[in-house]
């Protein structure tokens, strides 16, 4: 039986979101959540979780290219812990190195510079995080 999984691309101003199914291993972007200094509208996130009822939530873990942590890594972990604490959902972390760069390249390839709006980039980043998580699950 397949799982429904939500993914979040944590940021201090915007949090990208995507939903996917483990059967297909693919994801689709959902509208990004605005955040103020990394604090989201928890009610809006709660509504999203209630609507999709995911079996698992994946949060992108922003690491430096050499695998070391940065300030945003700590904040993304805190966001993941709060998701679990507030909503009781199973949360996993996924290395997200290069997802924003890949997302920008994908969007630019489709529509040029004008297509590069922040919420699209965040949504596609969340898709890439989720799809790479699905790939890692098949390896295990």
Swiss-Prot record:
Q: Top-down, what is the taxonomic lineage of the species of origin?
A: Bacteria, Pseudomonadati, Pseudomonadota, Gammaproteobacteria, Pasteurellales
Enzyme class at the top of the EC tree:
hydrolase
Q: What is this protein called?
A: Putative pre-16S rRNA nuclease
Listed GO CC annotations: cytosol
Per the annotation, which location comes first and is thus the protein's main one?
A: cytoplasm
Top-level taxonomic group: Bacteria
Q: Which organism is it from?
A: Pasteurella multocida (strain Pm70)
Supply the alphabetized keyword list. Cytoplasm, Hydrolase, Nuclease, Ribosome biogenesis
Residue ranges the record marks as coiled coil: none
Concerning Gene3D superfamilies, the annotation shows: YqgF/RNase H-like domain
- Per its database record, what is this protein's job? Could be a nuclease involved in processing of the 5'-end of pre-16S rRNA.
Q: What Enzyme Commission number(s) apply to this enzyme?
A: 3.1.-.-
Can the keyword Glycosyltransferase be found in this entry's annotation? Answer: no
Report the sequence similarity comment from the record.
Answer: Belongs to the YqgF nuclease family.
Q: Which SMART domains match?
A: YqgFc
């Amino acid at each position: 039986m397949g799982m429904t999984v939500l993914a979040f691309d944590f940021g201090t101003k915007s949090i990208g979101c995507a939903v996917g199914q483990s059967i297909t291993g693919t994801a689709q972007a959902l509208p990004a959540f605005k955040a103020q200094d990394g604090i989201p509208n928890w009610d809006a996130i709660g509504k999203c979780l209630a609507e999709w009822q995911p079996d698992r939530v994946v949060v992108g873990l922003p690491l430096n290219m050499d695998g070391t942590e940065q300030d945003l890594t700590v904040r993304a972990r805190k966001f993941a812990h709060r998701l679990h604490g507030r909503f009781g959902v199973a949360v996993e972390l996924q290395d997200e190195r290069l997802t924003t760069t890949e997302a920008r390249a994908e969007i630019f390839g489709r529509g040029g510079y004008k297509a590069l709006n922040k919420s699209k980039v965040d949504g596609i980043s969340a898709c890439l995080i989720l799809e790479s998580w699905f790939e890692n699950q098949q390896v295990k």
